[in-house]
Each structure stands twice: as structure tokens, then as C-alpha cells.
Amino acid sequence: MKNVVLLITDTFRYDNLKDYGERPVRTPALDTFMDDHATSVSRFYTGSFPTIPHRTDLARGVLGWPHYGWQPLVQSGPNHIARILGAQGYATQLICDCPHLFNAGFQSGFDAAFQHRGQEADKHLLHLNHPIPEAMPAEKTRRSPNWRGKTLADQHRWLNRYYETEAEMFSAKTSATAVRWLEENYKAPPFFLWVDLFDPHEPWDPPEYMVDRYDPEYSGEPMIHCNYGHATDYTETELHNLWAHYAAEAELVDRHIGSILQKIDDLALWDDTVVIVTSDHGTSIGEHDRTGKSNINDADDKE
């Protein structure tokens, strides 16, 4: 039986890859994976695309939307890929930084599960002696969910305020944990490894030197979180900086997924391993006068 490595990202646009997009993003690791090892699916129907409904589809093997929405996995039915593979003799491991998986019970059914805490205002440790500063203007970002009058962008940067270097970024930490797991378990096949990166979901806070490569002339406040509304709420330079933060975070994700793919290569696992790289959805960064994952508004043209 072949090993299975499932690599999930969140909010990773398909046109980040290769030369598919009008605004190029550097994704050398995934581009090489597509060329050398992968079958790329370019014509498809999306399933339940929000974070937990999407992963519920993957875990259960059936489409949940519109029969049920965002809910704990146990409420969606009995099937669970980890339990099914475990019954066939697979060792099963979940490694994630996505803050919603453990809340929805996805760790149940795995032999072992590990989460890096603190993504997207996941309040694992409070620092209330230190005030929560404004990460970006409130009128330029998503207003809810709100905590103590602070936006998600504010909460995220406050909780992770000591994280400045690349090694401290979530994609780096989670991928490093996956690399270590492969080194410590590759001699014990078959295994199922589910690695779940929440990046490049907003807030987009990669090292600013990476952002500068996409937007070297910008001198305003960093635009790290979209407003889930009209793109016209931003100036042209702010909107470009918003995209630059997203692009840099997507590049960072590519780099650290690349470290997992490189370790699979180092351990000579390709012939015995099915590797799946996927994402739940993309995001708007100015297209159709929207940023984020926005609803259709009453004032929108329906034709």
C-alpha cells in the first residue's frame, strides 16, 4: 500500500502558479512539483469551499454543501479518512496550524495530531499587560469577528507580536514539523500524513522584505488584511500593497511546502507515496471591485 501525504493550504489562488496570473507570484517549488511529479487538474467543479466544509468533504469523501454548512466533523457523518486508513493498517498523523481543525474535531480518528497555535487570532496565550495596537486602519480591514474592540488583524499581530523572522512564520514552523515527522517515520509504511497550512489566508504578515520585492515603492501603512468588501475603499497604491502582502505570503507557503517535497525526495519516497497538494479556495484582491471572500451585495449588477 502506498503512503499518502495530503498538503492543504488555505486561500491559495490557482493563478499563483506558473504564468497563469496577470500578476506573477514566485512559486518555484510547486511549479517544479507540477512539472516533475504531479497531475494538474485544471477543469473541475468546486465542492464545499469554506475552510471546514472543504476539509469535511476531503475527510468524508462526499460533498456536504448544501446539505450542511460549517459544523463539527462528527455531525457530518460517520466516515473519516483517518479512521478508514487506520483500519487498513496505516499510521495516521495530522499536523496543522489552521485554527479551526481542532475546534471542529478533525484530530479525532488520527493516531496522533499536532497544532501550532496562534493563527488568525487563535487566542492560546493572552498578553493583556500589553495593549493591543492597531495593525492597520479599521476602515481598511474586516470589522468582524471583533474582540475587545479590535479587528482580526489587530488580534493576530498582538498574539504573534514577537514573530518577525521567517523561521517564526506559521508556514515555516508547520512545514518544519512535517519534515521532522517524515524523518522519524519514513521507515514505517504505510502512513497517512495530513499537513494543513492556514496560510496564505489573511492576515498577510510575511517578512516585509519579501513584500518589498513585490511593492518596493510603497511607503504607507502595510495592508495586511482585506476588508471583505469594495476594493474602492482602498487607494490604488494601498490595493497593490494588499496584493503584495498576499503574494509574498503565497511565495512563503510555496517555499516551505517545497521543504516537505524536498524531504520526500531526500527519503526516496516518490515511488511509494501519493502526494496531494490542494487548497479550499482563492480570494479577491481587486477583481470585480472586491477584496476577500465577499457576498453579492444588493447594489451589484446581477446581469
Spans of model-derived segments:
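Catalytic domains that recognize anionic headgroups
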Residues: 1-303
